[in-house]
From Swiss-Prot:
Keywords: Cytoplasm, Decarboxylase, Lyase, Porphyrin biosynthesis. GO terms for molecular function: uroporphyrinogen decarboxylase activity. Substrate binds at R27, Q28, A29, G30, R31, D77, Y154, S209, H327. Gene3D superfamilies: 3.20.20.210. Its EC number is 4.1.1.37. GO terms for cellular component: cytosol. The keyword Lyase applies. This is Uroporphyrinogen decarboxylase.
Length: 354
């Protein structure tokens, strides 16, 4: 494997000194880029794009050609794991992801097998190894998965949900069934992430997009407990260096202390969290990633620069901060505004790393 030329992102996650704050964007390979739209049209549909390792590699690299980003993230989807479990994933126009065969009964859950990542998810592994090769040491490659709770919400609900009625009914009326599902998912995600590392991923992120829908105690029981199980089972060293792990619960600002106890290296913050407060609470234990509101990229460029300055000042001096948005970049953002954001982070952060 080629020597890593820019390891700023990995160093910041491990709280090692850096020359400036590293930056990348969730969904940086996405619909706001005209070149992404062209490649997606070539693929035919979203899952065909995910399943073609050459095209998945192409869209992963597209934002790096435009911007001086400090990391690449695998182009894939969190629902690859449930799809490999045989649920029949498809995308409904305007509806988002749906499953032909939801796992909303204990019998359906019992029948689920843990997928073999090299076999059932071989297309993802091929994408990881292709991207790692093509990056040629330019920046590190982030591998990722959804959290067990978040994957379970789609599997039980049969797709996206605003109320999470079916999975919450299962959580409170049939908790043993849900725990069985979450346990299988934790095993599946651990194998999946370790296979990504074996194929070249240099950092890992677990997206708990719907953890914030849970009550205080239910979050620990149904989400955090299973992320903890995954963290305990992950490969944390490869290619002669540490593989940092970031946990991100959207809406999880209440639970930063509990998340920091898992042994992860970093926590992702959404835009509802004050980064200065987060650093006071958990900065002694973990690095922090975030956390500009993605909608701020619609603002005039001087306003974006002002917001960047505010977040950098909030975090303050020293390493342990990876700048990012508080969630994925929106599809209608002007690519020039994204570029101005990235430049602002690099230019304005040097003063905090002297």
């Amino acid at each position: 494997m080629a020597e890593l030329k820019n390891d700023r992102y990995l160093r910041a996650l491990l709280k090692q000194p850096v020359d400036m704050t590293p930056v990348w964007m969730m969904r940086q390979a996405g619909r706001y880029l005209p070149e992404y739209k062209a490649t997606r049209a070539q693929a035919g549909d979203f899952m065909s794009l995910c399943k073609n390792h050459e095209l998945a590699c192409e869209v992963t690299l597209q934002p790096l050609r435009r911007y001086e980003l400090d990391a690449a993230i695998l182009f894939s989807d969190i629902l690859t794991v449930p799809d490999a479990m045989g649920l029949g994933l498809y995308f409904e126009a305007g509806e988002g992801p749906r499953f032909e065969r939801p796992t909303d009964t204990i019998d359906a859950i019992k029948k689920l097998a843990v997928p073999d990542p090299e076999d059932d998810l071989g297309y993802v592994m091929k994408a990881v190894s292709t991207i790692r090769r093509e990056l040629n040491g330019q920046v590190p490659l982030i591998g990722f998965s959804g959290s067990p709770w978040t994957l379970a919400t789609y599997m039980v609900e049969g797709g996206s949900s605003k109320t999470f009625e079916k999975i919450k009914k299962m959580a409170y009326a049939e908790p043993a069934a849900l725990h069985m599902l979450l346990d299988k998912l934790a095993d599946s995600v651990t194998l999946y992430l370790n296979a990504q590392v074996a194929n070249g991923a240099q950092s890992l992120m677990i997206f708990d997009s719907w953890g914030g829908a849970l009550s205080h105690t239910a979050y620990r029981e149904f989400s955090l407990r299973y992320m903890q199980k995954i963290v305990d089972g992950l490969t944390r060293f490869a290619d002669g260096r540490q593989v940092p792990v970031t946990l991100f619960t959207k809406g999880g600002g209440l639970w930063l202390e509990a998340m920091a106890e898992t042994g992860c290296d970093a926590l992702g913050l959404d835009w509802t969290v004050d980064i200065a407060d987060a650093r006071r609470r958990v900065g002694h234990k973990v690095a922090l990633q975030g956390n500009m509101d993605p909608s701020m990229l619609y603002a005039p460029i001087p306003r974006i620069e002002e917001e960047v300055a505010q977040i950098l000042a909030g975090y303050g001096e020293g390493t342990g901060h990876v700048f990012n948005l508080g969630h994925g970049i929106h599809q209608h953002v002007d690519p020039e505004h994204a570029g101005a954001f990235i430049k602002a982070v690099h230019a304005q952060s040097k003063q905090y790393h002297k």
